[in-house]
Amino acid sequence: MNCPAMTASPSSSSSSSYSTFRPPPPLLPQLSNDSQRSVVMHCTRLPFEAFAATSSNRLLGKHSLPLRAALVTSNPLNISSSSVISDAISSSSVITDDAKIGVLLLNLGGPETLDDVQPFLFNLFADPDIIRLPPVFQFLQKPLAQFISVARAPKSKEGYASIGGGSPLRHITDAQAEELRKCLWEKNVPAKVYVGMRYWHPFTEEAIEQIKRDGITKLVVLPLYPQFSISTSGSSLRLLERIFREDEYLVNMQHTVIPSWYQREGYIKAMANLIQSELGKFGSPNQVVIFFSAHGVPLAYVEEAGDPYKAEMEECVDLIMEELDKRKITNAYTLAYQSRVGPVEWLKPYTEEAITELGKKGVENLLAVPISFVSEHIETLEEIDVEYKELALKSGIKNWGRVPALGTEPMFISDLADAVVESLPYVGAMAVSNLEARQSLVPLGSVEELLATYDSQRRELPAPVTMWEWGWTKSAETWNGRAAMLAVLALLVLEVTTGKGFLHQWGILPSL
């Protein structure tokens, strides 16, 4: 694959006569260009040494965030302007000939066979960033994960069986890594690219061991999640923090982390290209509602833990629609969240509810865009392509389309390569020409500080007390829920420790 240069956007074949239908039905939340999220303001206050407010022409206009972190954990570089960057790269000490550069791609992982499904689910639910228990009950994390994984495995196996018996995520991520390696070499960066999965092989620990064996001296950590969330990039980075703290070799390694990259021009243009291409397959492209479906997270992650995911997702959709608008594509669009698990409230609107409501409003043409996924896996191939498509057709939507995940799309891979080059601690003569394009960076060990800063100015006054119609406060309901959870956990502990009980009788838990 040849890394493409950034080119002008293709002209749109879509008519703008349907612009009167924008924004979409008011019952769904609509993103407006003037509703800038507080995350943008918060990022300017991050207390790291290296900080630059750049107006990159590779980050899109007013949405660009300033550099917000140390570039090297052991030797941070103060940057105040592009002239300083130019001075730094002209120095003879930037990247030496004996430097060994590595790129670590982080992703979720997925079961490759049906036998892998239950242990994969166990690894997933054993992660405290996925199921957040109070500290005093964290000893129940693994028993609870065992219970949930065993209970959910049969249905999950059906889903994986319907897409070929396993997840294609590893194969696709390996292909992305190889294309990224080739692209970096074309950009005169002789880097090795590694894949570390959070919940299945090759695990992050395996990738780190290979990095050490290869003698890597400069490492760029790149989560394959465009938007940052506690439960995705955050979980992977916390694991890396633990690994780095326990290893002297890693502690002394210069490394850079790119926590999110949804604002990059290449990524935005690549997404817009895919959307434009799929719109062209409809009989009336300008009458299609663009339906962005993102993986959801519990609402408490955003409101209580300070997760910036919702703000970054909404801004990402804004950026893509602005790019499409430049191409005279002015379709209606909306954003919803999928893959909700359990009884707690997640980010809304839920994808299934939003699809149903659009059908009731008379929408006949719908184009689904898996906005938070860069690889095909069960949530695109089964949840969107099968479940949501079937729901859409039942709801009255006549024409359904789905934008493919980015995969190894050349512009996307080239932009990732540029992100790596631009984030190297000392770029040197190997860099591409445009060095002002710098995404937001944090060193390992800064995940908590990052989240704290996002949350620092969110609310100065406590929210008003919400009273449910039956007379209890939301806080009381929360504590009632916690009490019920503790009762369930106590029963689960008894089941696990004694090997007896109704869960064993029903075959949900294996007998000892």
Curated annotation (Swiss-Prot):
Q: Which family does it belong to?
A: Belongs to the ferrochelatase family.
* Pfam families assigned to the protein according to its UniProt record, in alphabetical order: Ferrochelatase (PF00762)
Q: Which NCBIfam families match?
A: hemH (TIGR00109)
Which membrane topology describes this protein? Peripheral membrane protein
Q: Where is the composition biased (Low complexity)?
A: 9-21
In which pathway does this enzyme or protein participate? Porphyrin-containing compound metabolism; protoheme biosynthesis; protoheme from protoporphyrin-IX: step 1/1
**Reactions catalysed, as given in the entry:** heme b + 2 H(+) = protoporphyrin IX + Fe(2+)
A single Gene Ontology biological process assigned to it is:
porphyrin-containing compound biosynthetic process
Q: Specify the species.
A: Arabidopsis thaliana
Record keywords: Aminoacyl-tRNA synthetase included?
Answer: no
Q: Kindly provide the name given to this protein in its UniProt entry.
A: Ferrochelatase-2, chloroplastic
Recorded hits in SUPFAM superfamilies, A to Z, give:
Chelatase, Chlorophyll a-b binding protein
Q: Which residues are annotated with the PTM N-acetylvaline?
A: V84
Q: Which GO terms describe its cellular component?
A: chloroplast membrane; chloroplast thylakoid membrane; plastid thylakoid membrane
